[in-house]
């Protein structure tokens, strides 16, 4: 409503203008926010409508660094590089993202997935000869991550991550194929941990350690150290322990600054169904041994369960695999490449199955039989496991004497009928081994702990050891069944007349 007073009209109009200006500012702000939201939605819509990006492997520059050779979708292509891409980041083997026009628009990381292959040999021009799990060999290029800014190049035997279609290897997988079959750490077993095998320890000390500790004397007498040692005998009697103790002793003798190595080859895991794979793995093991033996460092290659790999050729006991595996080992032992500072130690409880060519002088020169422990040796083994710091209910000497007397008592187990008509009684004592004694002591300790918890008495007692011996005799898995009577003679380590029949007698338990 207009008034006659001009001043009031002016004030009213100014208020109206101010309100309209404020409303207009709010509308402008809302319009701007709507436009921004619409722009975001439009961008999202465009992103959703955009074609999918593809990825490829950058191989090399071409055309004066203006184009790139890229392997993508199973095809080798030459593509343009977007100006937004930093060309310094484009290194061989890196993953790149391709735009709608098949243009390199983004540099990604080096590929982290692919197939595994073993490097056989390094070639010129950053290439390598690889072998896959089927035994097929091919040549691939090594990505920049393997050749640029690294302390050392990949070596033969390394496991590589490869893309066989692109023809590139991207990464060294830390676990080499040799390390999957072997353990290079020096064991912590010492001669003091082995009981009842003093004569065998002395023999292997003379055969293995003297050449490394007295090299000047060996050269003066023009005497070459043995290439290998065979430890054979019944199972569970300390063959593997001796080999580990030798490696530990060598490490102690030569000092911390020049360590020794113990390559423990897991025999059955060497076997492979593909032709030539087992032989190739043996070559890799000896290549690794020669590499470690540089600069005079002693290396022990220990083959456990040796008969599983190197059986007599033409025996018909297994497949024809041994006809090529045995010659491969003989080649490594007698080959042109020297095995200096490398000692082969083999362990087996079936020495009759090993090919004689491996056992002849000049190969496995020293053969040491590891016998089952007698009463005195058994006392020594018990003493290794019943140490002074272990709680006992009576003197340790008394415990050991009572246990040994019970273990070696006249307790018949089986009657063997030989082919000449004679018979032989085997007692439980004929099956005693160091591993069995260790298990007996562990059983006794467990019984002592249970008695201590029950509040009866504290410490290992003779009754615990005797109960453990009885339980071990009853449950021992060392004894074969009677379906093959000759197994009884083999398991106790006797060789003579063939067994025609075995009759279980049982015994006092």
UniProtKB/Swiss-Prot annotation:
Protein name, entry field: AAA ATPase forming ring-shaped complexes
Q: Which SMART domains match?
A: AAA
Q: Which gene encodes it?
A: arc
Under the heading Gene3D superfamilies, the entry gives: 1.10.8.60, 1.20.5.170, Nucleic acid-binding proteins, P-loop containing nucleotide triphosphate hydrolases
**Coiled coil region boundaries:** 11-50
Q: Which species is the source of this protein?
A: Corynebacterium diphtheriae (strain ATCC 700971 / NCTC 13129 / Biotype gravis)
**GO term, biological process aspect, one:** proteasomal protein catabolic process
Subunit (UniProt) = Homohexamer. Assembles into a hexameric ring structure.
Q: Which UniProt keywords apply?
A: ATP-binding, Coiled coil, Nucleotide-binding
